[in-house]
């Protein structure tokens, strides 16, 4: 029986890069991977859902001391930083106590929240936990994503949908979502919604289009988004005020 691979992992080294960027002796690798997992878990538990979209960890060495640089991509900078950077400094202290190493955190703002699979999946999970009807939630998420200029989206939800006694699977898709095309910029995320009648699984797959030759994912997305905005502006209807309109006479 065939098994589906993770679209993000399938594209590593082809059009995607790793979220942990470091190298070391083979003996230390398992320990450092476990350390990265602890850091990511601490950061995710420290902030509410639908806040952080990506965590990148870089390990550097300065004067024989290991130095960790963490890049946080978020749609809510105010929550991450807090008043006078209190939340950020508190997070740095927690991580330094956990791993006993110096840490620096860089925060980057993400604006197009409806185009990022992680944030879309987390938003759906939050609404399901608030007892919203799942079909309305999925349709709303798809409409918002399509308006932001993506090529296609697919959302899969499993569990006791609507409180039914028997668990089942439902999915909605719009546009083109080519999972096996390696040059396609596919963004994938999975999230769990803990409801009163059980755990629901939410999978979101978003297609941003094919990555152009000799271009990075970020460059390609910027090109496609600018093309979409230009097309959107050109398709706007021009209304004429009939009262003040006068025909030109030759």
UniProtKB/Swiss-Prot annotation:
One Pfam match: Ribosomal_S3_C
Keywords: Ribonucleoprotein, Ribosomal protein, RNA-binding, rRNA-binding
Coiled-coil stretches noted in the UniProt entry, renumbered to this chain: none
CDD domains documented for this protein: KH-II_30S_S3
Entry function: Binds the lower part of the 30S subunit head. Binds mRNA in the 70S ribosome, positioning it for translation.
Database matches in HAMAP family: Ribosomal_uS3_B
Name used for this protein in its record: Small ribosomal subunit protein uS3
